[in-house]
Amino acid sequence: MDLWLSIWLYASLAIAVVNLALLVRHWKEWDALKRLAPLAVTALVLHVWEEWRIPGGFWYLYNGGVPNYPMSQLTDMVTNFSGIVLGTIVVLYGANSITSIVMLAISGMEVMVHGVILRGKSEALYGVSYNPGMLTALCCFLPLAILFLVFLIRKRPKLRQILLGVVFAVIVNFACVALPEAFLADPASPYEFTDPGFYSNLAE
């Protein structure tokens, strides 16, 4: 597991490159929603890199400085890598209105979490609005959410598709975020974070 935790971010970058290559290859034949799907996967990869490495330190804000609970390297890897893999499966098998609603919901959630909730927490605790993940949330996920919404409105999905999209969005969020922490969160977890990243100079 230690080996995988040391390389999974780079594996994610490789997956992002594959997604972009598929986008270029199929640009002319794909409709707007299918084109947005690989961009959403790529945005997630960039988002994870911002949270973990550039500048990193998302865990420090999320955990209140605790290096391994409730979020550890293991739980957050499972959360993010599963999302990247699921998104890539959607790209490979063809995005549609239902999967696009899921991606719209996730994009909107990232904007809300980093742009509002964690921004407030970071301001309250450290006196800064920025939190790791905020830049990609606002510069990548926010435009994607708007584009998904615009093209979904143009596509006019049926009520059944909208409801299924909402249900699947809840399921994906539960499976990728809630379950890993429910089953893998451990105050004694050896998979701890060590670098406060952005908060290195702000931490007491």
PLM feature segments, named:
Residues 1-15:
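Hydrophobic transmembrane alpha-helical segments in integral membrane proteins
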Residues 23-36, 92-99, 151-164:
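Membrane-interface helix-boundary motifs at transmembrane edges
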Residues 24-26, 93-94, 115-126, 151-154, ...:
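Juxtamembrane "helix-exit" motif on the non-cytosolic side of transmembrane helices
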Residues 142-204:
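Terminal transmembrane helical module of multi-pass membrane proteins
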Residues 44-49, 107-119, 169-179:
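Aromatic-anchored segments of alpha-helical transmembrane domains
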Residues 39-42, 102-109, 159-171:
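Central hydrophobic cores of alpha-helical transmembrane segments
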Residues 28-82:
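Early transmembrane hairpin module of multi-pass membrane proteins
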Residues 82-144:
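Membrane-proximal helix-loop-helix units in multi-pass membrane proteins
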